[in-house]
Amino acid sequence: MSERVILAYSGGLDTSVAISWIGKETGREVVAVAIDLGQGGEDMEVIRQRALDCGAVEAVVVDARDEFAEGYCLPTIRNNALYMDRYPLVSAISRPLIVKHLVAAAREHGGSTVAHGCTGKGNDQVRFEVGFASLAPDLEVLAPVRDYAWTREKAIAFAEENAIPINVTKRSPFSIDQNVWGRAVETGFLEHLWNAPTKDVYAYTEDPTLNWSTPDEVIVGFERGVPVSIDGKPVSVLGAIEELNARAGAKGVGRLDVVEDRLVGIKSREIYEAPGAMVLITAHTELEHVTLERELGRFKRHTDQRWAELVYDGLWYSPLKAALESFVDKTQEHVTGEIRMVLHGGHIAVNGRRSAESLYDFNLATYDEGDSFDQSAAKGFVYVHGLSSKIASRRDQR
């Protein structure tokens, strides 16, 4: 048996061409691995058969939907992770899981090399290769699209010359990546920052102006930072994401038009759709406002952003990320309760909160009868709190 290459296979043009190209250029057999992350679209069995038709000696489909939701989407929720305060890491959190399964396939199928179809301009090349280096430094990595400067035109020509059974056209307006956590769209006319997205950009969300007269009220319940119910009915993490994708997407919630700082040093425009993700992160953040002590909440907002940056930058397996997650596990001990929201016109409006772990004390907060806050103590507190600023100002005014 010849040396084998384990290929991350999407079923698209580049990775279909890569199967034949790797065989011709290296003489190695290719095992194609397709991961089901809830992306929808083509049936995974169709994708598996396409890989075989393109020349793979074996084609493996892994149903990783629950694993993705529990092990990758859930930490994103608990860390309120929005890169640059906007992007819920739709693609970034999927790459380490794909890496994990490619390494497992390499061990099972005798692979000495892993391969991906990433370009040299994006973040995914880093996420894949740093992941491989972390989990399996003995494996060689092939990146034919990047290392041999493939263009779409070159890939189509190769497919035609070698009778690769895939239907393609030379004009496709967008590059799309999607999974159950969301959908990312880039390139084409979107590369011009002044161009507004057209209707055909979107697939997970409806036009926010539709169904304007019928808002959807939803209650999301959490236990220790984990979403466990919707409108009082128990759900898995995957079930919560899927239901909220449908309900929030129908109200146009989760559309994001972002210019982001890529790891490779350039700025890139991306259109994201993440209805379920944005509802869950919004609800979780709001519940933390109710249940976390002030200093803990302030500090966690810093670690949330750092966690998002580490994941975006491909450092899923880093010691710092692991340490931050140990911290976050501790913070979630009291993040239990329910958040009520109205989904309407592309917006999420929180209008109710309840928790047995709440730090909100009505008697301390009220300005009406029953007020138990000792306002007479405030005068001395204000004096001491502002004393250092008062002394500094006195000096600076000399």
UniProtKB/Swiss-Prot annotation:
Q: Does the keyword Transmembrane apply?
A: no
Q: In which pathway does it act?
A: Amino-acid biosynthesis; L-arginine biosynthesis; L-arginine from L-ornithine and carbamoyl phosphate: step 2/3
Give the top-rank taxon of the lineage listed in the UniProt record for this protein: Bacteria
Q: What is its EC number?
A: 6.3.4.5
Which residues make up the binding site for L-citrulline? 87, 123, 127, 175, 260, 272
Q: Establish whether keyword Nucleotide-binding is in the entry.
A: yes
Q: Where does ATP bind?
A: 8-16, 117
The top EC class, named as a word, is ligase
Give the keywords, sorted: Amino-acid biosynthesis, Arginine biosynthesis, ATP-binding, Cytoplasm, Ligase, Nucleotide-binding
The record's GO CC annotations read: cytoplasm
Instruction: Offer one example of a GO biological process linked to this entry.
Output: argininosuccinate metabolic process
Q: Which reaction does it catalyse?
A: L-citrulline + L-aspartate + ATP = 2-(N(omega)-L-arginino)succinate + AMP + diphosphate + H(+)
* A Pfam family annotated for this UniProt entry: Arginosuc_syn_C
InterPro entries recorded: Arginosuc_syn_C, Arginosuc_syn_N, Arginosuc_synth, Arginosuc_synth_CS, Arginosuc_synth_type_1_subfam, AS_cat/multimer_dom_body, Rossmann-like_a/b/a_fold
Q: Which GO terms describe its molecular function?
A: argininosuccinate synthase activity; ATP binding
Binding locations of L-aspartate: 119, 123-124
According to its UniProt record, where is this protein located?
A: Cytoplasm
What family does the database annotate? Belongs to the argininosuccinate synthase family. Type 1 subfamily.
The cross-references to HAMAP family, in alphabetical order and at most eight, read:
Arg_succ_synth_type1 (MF_00005)
UniProt subunit comment: Homotetramer.
Indicate what this protein is called per its UniProt record.
Answer: Argininosuccinate synthase
Name the lineage.
Answer: Bacteria, Bacillati, Actinomycetota, Actinomycetes, Mycobacteriales
Q: Encoded by which gene?
A: argG
